[in-house]
Amino acid sequence: MKILRITVNGLPLFKQELDLLFYTQQRVSEDDKEKLYKIEPNYYLHTACAFIGINASGKTSVLKVINLALNILRNEPINHVESRNILGGCENASFKICFFDNKRNICCLETVVKSKKAKAGGYVYSIVEEKLWEKPVSSVKSKKYLTDFSGLRPIAARNTDEAYLPDDVSFIIAHNKKTNDRIDVFSLLSYTNINVLPFTDDIPLEVITFLDPTIEKLCFEKIEDKALIHLKFKGEEELILNNAVELEQYLSSGTIKGIITFSMVKEVLASGGYLLIDELENHFNKEIVVTLMRFFMDSSLNKSGSTLIFTTHYSELLDEYDRNDAIYIVRNRNGITAENLSYILKRNDIKKSDAYQSGFLEGTTPAYEAYMRLKKNLAASLK
């Protein structure tokens, strides 16, 4: 199962409809094909999607929407999904998720979610309406109509027959079972500011030495109910630790995050799934970040069409892209918006980082007035 498009309406933090496309909009050259994933002749998916914006622009919120949409599609109860808080106190939030299934059909799931105040505080969410459309990809005449279902009747709608279903679980579960289809989602949203290495049976030595060449050994051992960590640096005695938190005394935050991330990358590339990372550059140097992006963009390595979806502050990362349509500019001006760079910047040959830093794209650099106020405040405090 591959995601083609996510369109969301009715979210409190968003200024307007959020419309995210994961297939190519611009013309695909022969060179481009090496970095894309082909689902059909002339139809290609991005393997690395970037969301960039200044601080507090709403990048994390966009990633939460994507995470929630993917989890709806994989039959997860909405009230158990960590990113459900993006729904807030929504009255009727509508998710339209277009995807390509393993029967070579283009499908569109529309799920309407409402909130209800919980007695203990917060909100409880339920699905109040659902419809599913389907059409064979062979019936699509051009890319323009790939996710267009106008004029088609839904093949299924949520009704009382789904009484056995929890009211926060999508009825797409029936379609997934019928087609024996699934979607694997790996999220590092919760690891943005927390770096604790979880217990794992296998940390590839190649990952460890890539991140820190001074480490000779790092592995977990489970004895009864107790987990021990064996850590050895070259030329030093082996250390045995009782708690993963203790690793922070010996390893950098970048090494810990790197082990978590690259171990997950291995699973994602094997499954053809989705990896969501907030602030990709956090704790990493540029070379490590670029390496991670290139793993997904390398069709000889990424044979299953796995997708990296990430946020960043760093415009230099945009220059890794030959295309503009895999990049979204996120802004928050009385509400969050995400705009595809190909709609703003028509030419691919313009250096993307320069366009971003220059302010040409609007809303991509801190406001000059805010900068001057901060400078004056700092100057006054130093008198």
Predicted regions and their residues:
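C-terminal lobe/lid and adjacent interdomain/linker elements of RecA-like ASCE P-loop ATPase modules
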Residues: 1-2, 293-383
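Pre-Walker A-like glycine/lysine-rich segment at the N-terminus of P-loop NTPase domains
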Residues: 2-67
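Extended helical coiled-coil dimerization/tether regions that scaffold
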Residues: 9, 184-250, 369-383
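Glycine-centered tight beta-turn/hairpin loop motif at sheet-sheet or coil-to-beta transitions
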Residues: 13, 100-106, 234-236
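Conserved P-loop NTP-binding catalytic core
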Residues: 44-50, 54, 64-114
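Electropositive, glycine-dotted interaction segments
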Residues: 113-224
